[in-house]
Each structure stands twice: as C-alpha cells, then as structure tokens.
C-alpha cells in the first residue's frame, strides 16, 4: 500500500511541492526568502482580517476607528503594528528575493520571473491602497498626489483620475473602493504566488553555481523545511523586536494627524519602500516623463532575461558584474534616501544622476560586462 501523501489527490500536490520536491543540495540562505515571503503574506492576510473586523471605511470615522482598534480592542495595538510593520518586512524580503534572482541569474526562468514582476506590481498596489486607509494627513495627500499622476496620460487622463476617485477629489467613494481593493488584492497575490511556484517547479530551483543540478538532488523535507523554519524563527524575532520596541520607526508622524483637505503637509512622501521609485519619478521635470520612468523602473526587470550576454548564469565567478551589481544596490539605497529629501539643490541633481545610473547599469553596463567577461575567458 502506498503512503497516503503519495496517493491522495490533494496531499499529492502538497507532497510534490513541499516534501518530496527534488532540490539542489547547495542552495544558500538567500533562497530562504521565497518561503519568508509566503509567511509574510499569511501574516498580512490574518492581521488584516482582524483589523477589517473593526475598521470602518468612511471618511468621518476611518481615523477614529483605527484609534479605537489601538485603544479599545484586545491586543488591537499589536495587530495594527504587526500589520503596518509587516508591510515593511514584506518589502525587505521582496527586494532581497529580487536581488538574489538578479545575482544568481534566476531571471532566466522567464515564466517564473515574469509572474514575479506581476507580483511585485500587485504588492506595490496593495501597499499603496492600504496606506490610504488610516485616513491621516499622509494617507490623504499621498492618495491625491499618486492618483493625480494618471492625469498625465494624454486625452483620457483627467477622466481616468475622476473615475478612480469616484468624484472630483479624494473622498468617501475613494476610501471605500480602496478598502475593497486592499481586501481582495492579497488573495489575488496568493493565487499568483501559487502559479509562481508551479512554474518554478516545472524547471526546478536554480543554485548559487548557476549550473544544472539534476544529477544531484535532495528531498526538500527534512533538509530545506528545517532551514526555512530556522529562517522564519529568526525573521519573526527581528520583526517582533521592531513591532514591540520601535513600532513607529518606519512610519510617518504626519499620519497621526487626521486628513485635512485644507492643510498640505510640508513634505509629501510615500512609505520608505517606495522612495526609490518616487525619487526616479521626481528626477524628471515633465509629468508624463516622470510617470513613464516610474513604471519603467520596475518594468526594466522584465528585460533582464533578454539582456543576459554572459556564458555563465550566476555572478558568483564574475567580479566585473559583481561590482556593477553592488553599485546598483548602492544606487538604490541612494535613491531611497533622495526620495525622502525635499526637492531642492543638491538633492535634485543627485536624484537625476542616480536615476540615470540605475537604468544605465541594468540596460547598458551589465550586458557589456557579460561580453567583456566572455572575452576575458576566451569563450
């Protein structure tokens, strides 16, 4: 008689994905972030569900309902701060996961990579509409500024913005629909994540060497299940330290002031995880040009499989490309800092130079470095 997990139609799927999955024997800690992202998503859905039980999506009561959650609901303060900081944790894991994909050439699995880019867009959309819900000053003005960018689209722009707002400004209709979007999107993300895994398991995981490991695979359980569990425990410890000791460290103090359409905050800026894209948006003086650059800053990732010129998959043995990769990371950190600064010299020119460097490294320097390395190795 066969084991139930190998014969039962439902358990068989789980078995092939998480138990008997053939896995490369040498994947490092950088491969932990996929499972950590799954954990983050579950955490966000659960905390979000409990918050939705007490939240009201009305302009008059939204702010006070969040205050009520923090003051009157049992452990409401904990649920709220876990959800707010859980978004930061999600994006930290997401950016490391993408960085690992670039470093080790995982983008050559095109279907998995493209679904990943779609997941990134959806996660960013979810985080944006979620940030509007507490209805503080930065929520209101962030929603106004970012949705207004769509008015740069020729001919239909203004109509599109008013259609999204549900009126002539960000108001009750906007808040209600943003709450609806914020509730449904994580489930769409979960469905896409399953498709992401499905395509990954079609090809098998990549590994740090970037070479096929078909002849030398080990089962996922107990080796990598234990490793993922250890990673999850470590991340939860760091996360709970942030939530319990520094819950407002990553937030904006302006969001503790109720939304007021008559009073503009001195510096309108998004959460830290959007600052790099915001800096790229602001670096172009033209509105439409800025919007295009903003979208391209993420969409440029889709070009990576087609710009791969090296005969090696991974950057592990390619010092020139490694230098460019870490320059790219530094550049993104610089853009993140610039995004939080006011629009004045010298920040304007630094932001513009960093934006040019960002696109140049991905689209010009990295493909060139691959060709140079091939030449040096006489390939």
Curated annotation (Swiss-Prot):
Tagged with keyword Transferase: no
Residues annotated as binding a ubiquinone: 201
Membrane topology of the entry: Multi-pass membrane protein
GO molecular function, one term: metal ion binding
Keywords: Electron transport, Heme, Iron, Membrane, Metal-binding, Mitochondrion, Mitochondrion inner membrane, Respiratory chain, Transmembrane, Transmembrane helix, Transport, Ubiquinone
Leader sequence residues: none
GO terms of biological process kind: mitochondrial electron transport, ubiquinol to cytochrome c
Entry protein name: Cytochrome b
Species per Swiss-Prot/TrEMBL record: Thomomys townsendii (Western pocket gopher)
Highest classification ranks of the organism: Eukaryota, Metazoa, Chordata, Craniata, Vertebrata
């Amino acid at each position: 008689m066969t084991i139930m997990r190998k014969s039962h139609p439902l358990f068989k799927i789980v078995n092939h994905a998480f138990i008997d999955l053939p896995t490369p024997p040498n994947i490092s800690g950088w491969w932990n972030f996929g499972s950590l992202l799954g954990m983050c998503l579950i955490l966000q859905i659960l905390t979000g569900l409990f918050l939705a039980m007490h939240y009201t999506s009305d302009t008059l009561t939204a702010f006070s309902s969040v205050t009520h959650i923090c003051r009157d609901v049992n452990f409401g303060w904990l649920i709220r701060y876990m959800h707010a900081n859980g978004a930061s944790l999600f994006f930290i894991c997401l950016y490391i996961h993408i960085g690992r994909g670039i470093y080790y050439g995982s983008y050559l699995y095109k279907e998995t990579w493209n679904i990943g880019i779609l997941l990134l867009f959806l996660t960013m959309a979810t985080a944006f509409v979620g940030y509007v819900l507490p209805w503080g000053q930065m929520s209101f003005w962030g929603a106004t500024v970012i949705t207004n960018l769509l008015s740069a689209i020729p001919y239909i722009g203004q109509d599109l913005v008013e259609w999204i707002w549900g009126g002539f400004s960000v108001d009750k209709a906007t808040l209600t629909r943003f709450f609806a979007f914020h509730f449904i999107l994580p489930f769409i993300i979960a469905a896409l994540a399953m498709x992401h895994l499905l395509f990954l398991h079609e090809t098998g995981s990549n590994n740090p060497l970037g070479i096929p490991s078909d002849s030398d695979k080990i089962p996922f359980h107990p080796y990598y299940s234990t490793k993922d569990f250890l990673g999850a425990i470590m991340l939860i410890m760091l996360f709970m330290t942030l939530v319990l000791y520094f819950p407002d460290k990553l937030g904006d103090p302006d969001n503790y002031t109720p939304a007021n359409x008559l009073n503009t905050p001195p510096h309108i800026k998004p959460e830290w995880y959007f600052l790099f894209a915001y800096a790229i948006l602001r670096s172009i003086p033209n509105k439409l040009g800025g919007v295009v650059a903003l979208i391209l800053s993420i969409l440029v990732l889709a070009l990576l499989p087609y710009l791969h010129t090296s005969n090696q998959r991974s950057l592990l043995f390619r010092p020139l490309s490694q230098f460019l990769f870490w320059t790219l990371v530094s550049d993104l950190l610089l853009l993140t800092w610039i995004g939080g600064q006011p629009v004045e010299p010298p920040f304007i020119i630094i932001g513009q130079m960093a934006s040019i460097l960002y696109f140049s490294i991905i689209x010009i320097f990295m493909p060139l470095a691959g060709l140079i390395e091939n030449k040096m190795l006489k390939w």
